Amino acid sequence: MNARADAFTIGPAAFRNRVFLASGPAGYGTEYAGLINLERLGGVVTKTITFRPRAGNPGRRLWETEAGLLNSIGLENVGAARFFAEKLPRLVESGARAVVSLGAEDWDDYRSLLDAAARSPDVDAVELNLSCPNVDRGGMSIGSDPSLVERYVRSAREALPRSAIIAKLTPNVADITVLARAAADGGAHAATAINTLVGMDLAGDGAEPVFRRVRAGLSGPAIFPVALDAVWRIAKSGTLPVVASGGIASVRDARKFLAAGAVAVEIGTAIFRDPGLPERIVDAL
């Protein structure tokens, strides 16, 4: 392992290497403990937590495409109280370096969520999900507005002064570097690029949308070139350190992200079919 995979820091948080599990596919983190040695990874980003429990979207939630995966999960989660009391301590006890993904439907819930996070002794790093495309409120509707990105990031920085603040950005805008600048102005220590692209599919040969919400988030190899472009542009702008997420399916993909200027990489959808990939990337870098 060379210096690209060795220990590094994002703001006040130290990580053992540059290979993370992305938010979403790994659930609360411990679901993959029997398949992945979580202690070997730089970090494990939890599924997104909201202040109140969410049941998620009704109907079908996952749909495979020829080069990726559409999801309409809808931020299903147990809510802040159970997460900070049960799920997060269990992940920390496993030896994983936890990065907590925080989301919100509105400003009041977001402030309450930050207060709950501030009371937890286990929150050293957070990734603000300002970019989920498959919810009615919050998510991408916040993250596509630079002024709101700055406001939400600044609030997190003030509420969690001893934690690393990472803003996860949406690619569904004209210029993602504008969002990176807004996150930096709000005090973010880094940005994650990217979240899913908006897409849809029709069932069979008919005209019936696969998902009840019609549109969903596309991940997997199909979005790798888009993610690589976003990482390249943010890195070249010098605005913020950037964590790469989107379409990694091989060691080669991870190396390309690092060559494009990423400080770390997140593996997500690929672990559904290849849970050994994150550790192989750790070994190869």
Please annotate each region the language model reported.
Residues V19-S23, G42-T46, A98-L102, V126-L128, ...:
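Hydrophobic faces of well-ordered beta-strands that scaffold small-molecule active sites
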Residues M1-A98, A104-E105, I281:
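N-terminal capping/small domains of soluble enzymes
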Residues L38, G56-E66, L202-A216, L258, ...:
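C-terminal helical cap(s) of enzyme catalytic domains, especially alpha/beta-barrels
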Residues A26, S101-A104, L169-D175, F224, ...:
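Glycine-rich beta-to-alpha transition loops that act as phosphate-gripper elements at the mouths
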Residues T30-I36, D109-S120, V173-G186, A235-L240, ...:
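Catalytic cores of alpha/beta
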Residues T46-F51, A125-C132, A190-M200, G247-I248, ...:
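Glycine-rich phosphate-binding active-site loops on the catalytic face of alpha/beta enzymes
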Residues Y32, A80, F84-L88, Y110-D115, ...:
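Generic structural signal for well-ordered alpha-helices
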Residues L69, P133-S147, L179-L240, R280:
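Glycine/Thr-rich beta-alpha phosphate-binding loop at enzyme active sites
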